[in-house]
Amino acid sequence: MGKKSLAEQIADIANKPQVEDFDIENDEGVFQHGGSDSDVSSGDESEEELKKQHYVAVGKSKLRNVVDQGLAVKDKKYVGSKGSRAELFNDEEMDAPEQGESESEAESGSEESDAVSFRSDSEDVSESEATSESEIEKDREEDEETAMKKEKLAKIVQTQTKQVINNLAHSAQRDASKGYAILQQNKFFDKILDSRIKLQKALSASNQLPLSQQSWDELLDENNSKLLTSTFKVLEKVLTQCVTVRHKFQIGDHINQSENPSDFDNSKKRSFKELVHETVTLDSDLKSYRSAVLNKWSAKVSASSGKSLLQASKFKAINQSADVQVDNQLADMPRLLKRTKLNRSNTKPLLFDEDLQKGLLKELQLEENVEGDIEEENNLDIPKNYDPRRKDNNALDFTQNPYIYDDEDFYRVLLNDLVEKKISNSQQSNGVTLAITSRSENKLKKNIDTKASKGRKLNYSIQEPIANYEASVNTGYKWSDEQIDEFFAGLLGQKINFNEDDELEADTMHNEEDEEIKNDDIQIFG
């Protein structure tokens, strides 16, 4: 094969693959591929040699010669210290007790060698035994001290565990007593609500009683009088029992500190007025104690819940103490009393209309408003409580009756709380909730006509008939019958002549003129 040209050599170099291909059937190629590691290593060495070809040959440095010859250490700190064999053996015995056997074997070998070394070895052994005994005693003492410390620690731990158990038991007992007291309070409150619910019917029925003494006398008979006397006796008995219980309770809890238990006489018979007076005094004595208790427990509850830390919301009514909330609710007493006089159930006392007509119900009469508006003073025919939106504008508005007591809104709130509490206790797993809504017929709604706006309907009220009224009579001047007849005839467009003679003469003259006209011999139109 001839020599390749320059172009062929350049083409071979350019077309040479980066990864060399190996033929499987070529054994030499496979063998060369298997020994590629050695070739690579030899190639690396040759590459390193090629890299160092330009280096200049340099001999060893002075430091290297010193290291090869060995360092001549002349400083004292590098010189070792001499020691005896006894010290060496003592150190070895302290480090490991098993080395004693090897030392004894070495000592026996040394005794066979020479007597001088035997004497020195025996002295060393005696010294080591003495030191070992002292160390054993020290170890025993240390073990005893550690045992004593452990016993003391165990006793301290036992006493502390007993104290913790006792504290837990006392805290559990306190918590149990508090829980029992709360349960008893809830039961007592439920009983009070139950009695209040039972009294609601009697309270609503009492609003139907007569209002005046005349109606009482008219409706009262023997059976009713007997029933009244019996109920009055029962009421006095219940009031006396309530007063005695409250006296015992307040004296026992040191609420009434001025009184003694012996000063209160249960056997003394009191009148109804005296019982009412005693209840008022008991309420006044209980007020300060109640406010203190409410303030105490509300502060504890707010501290446990973290509400006291929220300074931004302390002025809200719900974040104030319980006694302050109660005082705020009772501050506007006229408004609360006015709400109790609203006739929500539309009850009407017996003989109410008769008493109203007779003027026996003074509180329901219309009062003159001296500071009224000028329009009301000018329009005297319009009642003061006139409302054009109402369907029936009577002179009196009976939706607010001062002779009744109706707290149905407060009663329904209590009833709703009681029922929700019962349901939550009995059916917690089911999560059943009940919302009690008052009936629409029991709600107080104003009788307003919604179609009377924008002039679509003209509302009016019929004026009541005026009593004891008579038109004035002027006796100074009277009309005659002729004037009256002429006046009414003139209204109807007629004219009446009351002179009959003149009328007859006029008739005769008229007849004569007619005859003369007929006989005048003048003929018109043929």
UniProtKB/Swiss-Prot annotation:
Predominant subcellular localization, coarse grouping: nucleus
Keyword tRNA processing on entry: no
Cysteine disulfide partners in this protein: none
Nucleus in keyword set: yes
GO annotation, biological process: maturation of SSU-rRNA from tricistronic rRNA transcript (SSU-rRNA, 5.8S rRNA, LSU-rRNA)
Family statement drawn from the similarity comment of this UniProt entry: Belongs to the AATF family.
This protein's name: Protein BFR2
Gene that this polypeptide is encoded by: BFR2
